Amino acid sequence: MASGTAVNAAPSGGPGDVSLEEPKKMTREDWRKKKELEEQRKLGNAPAEVDEEGKDINPHIPQYISSVPWYIDPSKRPTLKHQRPQPEKQKQYSSSGDWYKRGVKEHSIATRYRKGACENCGALTHKKKDCMERPRKVGAKYTGMNIAPDEHVQPQLMFDYDGKRDRWNGYNPEEHMKIVEEYAKVDLAKRTLKAQKLQEELASGKLEQVERDHNSEDEDEDKYADDIDMPGQNFDSKRRITVRNLRIREDIAKYLRNLDPNSAYYDPKTRAMRENPYANTGKNPDEVGYAGDNFVRYTGDTISMAQTQLFAWEAYDKGSEVHLQADPTKLELLYKSFKVKKEDFKAQQKESILEKYGGQEHLDAPPAELLLAQTEDYVEYSRHGTVIKGQEKAIACSKNEEDVKINNHTCIWGSYWKEGKWGYKCCHSFVKFSYCTGEAGKEIANAEANLLEEQPREEEHMTKPKTLMEIHQEKQKEKKKKKHKKSSNSDSEGEEKKKQEKLKKALNAEEARLLQVKEIMQLDERKRPYNSVYETREPTEEEMEAYRMKRQRPDDPMASFLGQ
């Protein structure tokens, strides 16, 4: 016992030995010295503690962090190793250069069985219990034939935070050579096109002018590059379209257009400036290059949607159950039908007024400028008729080209007019790109006209074309006639008798159906026969009327007297 006690009480001799002494309670003096030493270290008057690696320990670290647990280091040496990541708990991540192998060729098939391979197929990459091939009657281990090739097993990659987000990981730089070759082909095509165009200009004698216009070779290359689309790219050099976050150098930022802090507000998150930055400067919004983003609020279907919403509110006030968000399709169809009916009503109202009071000729009159040959434009003329002040009246130009004679014609197109057709005066031809036939063409045209005049006119087959007003009036009359016929037919006695007979048959069928339903409902649920209520045809009006007449209404206070 004495020797054992002496061993336990003896201090460790070597520096690497771990002391197994029980912790002793500190005296008041030792505790006070320890606290004073800590204060001196915090003030910088005493050197800081040093760990086993020679690193200083910050004296301001709290004790519950700097104190070492007994199960980590029983020697109680000052250290912060327990606060650092433990090596045995660190995950082993794959390096940045590791990636899945692509395009790996299968190895050559073995001719004899190898030790440790699958007994069923002979592959080295798996065992018999993991084999996915059909179980053979005699395995490859015993036959040594039809040995399957070894599968290529991809590595199990485990990347850290940066490795998972590395977009270039696994990229083969040799793939970029394909793009380089493609650009080289485009460059060769440019040079070929340039050489071909120079040859054409040299042959036509325009080479000097080209050399004077394009002095540098770079400008010439840009000229040809604008005409050729790059592969996979559709770019128009005349309309430079930029992305939202990319601006050209000449563009002015929205927040720099007006430096007054009380001007239009610029939202940096959405990069939007709703109001006009030049509102308080007195500039016309039509003259400035940028007048705010509020114009976007009135583009697209915004106005039509606002009109639909207004129609929904008005229809709801008048008793129609429509809502823009709840029933958008119903509201859209209702609004379209409303607009059509409104236009028809206006047209009918206009027609009725014109029929009653007349005045259609005033609506077909030409504009006042053409009718009175005067405008509000001020023009001052001299004594000789020349314009002194104002803009001279433009001479009306013909829509046809003047003084252009084609296909041997001696007159221009439009020099001849007959029966609403334009033609050539030289040959009376009404085909624009026809060849001139001269006097012979005139004689043929006159002979055809005389032949048509000699033929008897069949006036009964010739009908004068009707105007839109007459066609609309005829349609309205036909609608009224149809309505009158329907009302007269429905009031006839024969139709009424037929309807009564059909209704009687429908009532009998409905009573039979109700009796059948009553019998089925009296049976047990498990003994009821299968009865399908599916009907392919639509019920007639008489069947619906019979169903309504025979239907029981529990809410009706007189329903209890029906069976009496």
From Swiss-Prot:
InterPro entries: Slu7_dom, Splicing_factor_SLU7
Chain intervals with Basic and acidic residues compositional bias: 21-42, 495-507, 535-556
Protein name (Swiss-Prot/TrEMBL): Pre-mRNA-splicing factor SLU7
Keywords, in A-Z order: Cytoplasm, Metal-binding, mRNA processing, mRNA splicing, Nucleus, Spliceosome, Zinc, Zinc-finger
Superkingdom assignment: Eukaryota
Gene Ontology, cellular component aspect: cytoplasm; nuclear speck; spliceosomal complex
Gene this protein is translated from: SLU7
Taxonomic lineage from the root: Eukaryota, Metazoa, Chordata, Craniata, Vertebrata
Subunit structure, interactors included: Component of pre-catalytic, catalytic and post-catalytic spliceosomes. Associates with the spliceosome prior to recognition of the 3'-splice site for step II, probably during catalysis of step I.
Any single GO BP term: mRNA splicing, via spliceosome
UniProt-annotated stretches for the region Disordered: 1-61, 75-100, 204-231, 473-507, 519-564
